[in-house]
Amino acid sequence: MASKLLRAVILGPPGSGKGTVCQRIAQNFGLQHLSSGHFLRENIKASTEVGEMAKQYIEKSLLVPDHVITRLMMSELENRRGQHWLLDGFPRTLGQAEALDKICEVDLVISLNIPFETLKDRLSRRWIHPPSGRVYNLDFNPPHVHGIDDVTGEPLVQQEDDKPEAVAARLRQYKDVAKPVIELYKSRGVLHQFSGTETNKIWPYVYTLFSNKITPIQSKEAY
C-alpha cells in the first residue's frame, strides 16, 4: 500500500448524503473531513476578514463567490499539508478546481448520483441546527426529540431552499456548475461515480474503493 498522502474530493447535489459518506470515510480511514460549510460558519462566528466577506453574501441568500471561498479553503489546506484529507463542498466550480490544482494533486474524486425524486424527498424531510450545521433527516437520522437539536436542546429549522418548490432550482444550479468540474476529473481518470437511492447500499462500494488506496484504521467496516 502506497504511503503517499491521499487527497480526495466528494461531489454531489444537496441531499445526496455527502455528509454521511464523509463521516464514514473519516471514521474508517482516518482522513480529515474538510467541509467548506463548517469553515465558513467558523470564520463568520469568529468575524475573520474572510468570514465577514462571506457573511455579506450569505445574508442575501447569494452564493459565496469563488475568490472568497477559495481564499478560505487555501488557508485551511496550507495548515494540513501533512494530512490525508477529504474535501466536502469544495471545489464547487471549475475556477475553484483550478485554484486547488495550484497547491496539490487530487488523487480520488467521488461523485454521488441520486435520482431527483429521492433528493426531493430527502430535502423535504431535512431539518438543521444552523449554529452548528448539524443535519437531521426525519426518516433515517431523526433527532431524539422532534424539532430539537440533540446536543444543545435548541430548535431545529427547515431551510427555505429545502422546501419542495426551491429544490428543483437548486438541483439545476448544481448540475450546471458541477458539470465542468466532473468532466475535468473524469478526463484525468480520478473520477468514480456512484448511483443509488440509499447511502447504505452505495457505501460498501465506496469502502472498497478507498481500501484499495489507503489501509483502513479499523479492522471491521464501521457504519
Curated annotation (Swiss-Prot):
The reaction(s) this protein catalyses: a ribonucleoside 5'-phosphate + ATP = a ribonucleoside 5'-diphosphate + ADP; AMP + ATP = 2 ADP; GTP + AMP = GDP + ADP; CMP + ATP = CDP + ADP
Subcellular location: Mitochondrion matrix
Annotated residues for binding of a ribonucleoside 5'-triphosphate: 15-20, 126, 135-136, 199
UniProt keyword Transferase present: yes
Inducing or repressing factors: By hypoxia (at protein level).
GO-annotated biological processes: ADP biosynthetic process; AMP metabolic process; ATP metabolic process; cellular response to hypoxia; GTP metabolic process; nucleobase-containing small molecule interconversion; nucleoside triphosphate biosynthetic process; regulation of oxidative phosphorylation
PROSITE patterns: ADENYLATE_KINASE
Recorded consequence of changing residue 7 to G: Abolishes mitochondrial import
Span list, region LID: 125-162
Region of interest (NMP), residue spans: 35-64
EC code(s) of this entry: 2.7.4.4, 2.7.4.6
Modified residues (N6-succinyllysine): 60, 179, 186
Cellular-component GO terms for this entry: cytoplasm; mitochondrial matrix; mitochondrion
Keywords from the named record: Acetylation, ATP-binding, GTP-binding, Kinase, Mitochondrion, Nucleotide-binding, Transferase
Entry binding sites for AMP: 36, 41, 62-64, 89-92, 96, 170
Alphabetical list of NCBIfam families matching this protein: adk
Domain comment as written in the entry: Consists of three domains, a large central CORE domain and two small peripheral domains, NMPbind and LID, which undergo movements during catalysis. The LID domain closes over the site of phosphoryl transfer upon GTP/ATP binding. Assembling and dissambling the active center during each catalytic cycle provides an effective means to prevent GTP/ATP hydrolysis.
Family: Belongs to the adenylate kinase family. AK3 subfamily.
UniProt protein name: Adenylate kinase 4, mitochondrial
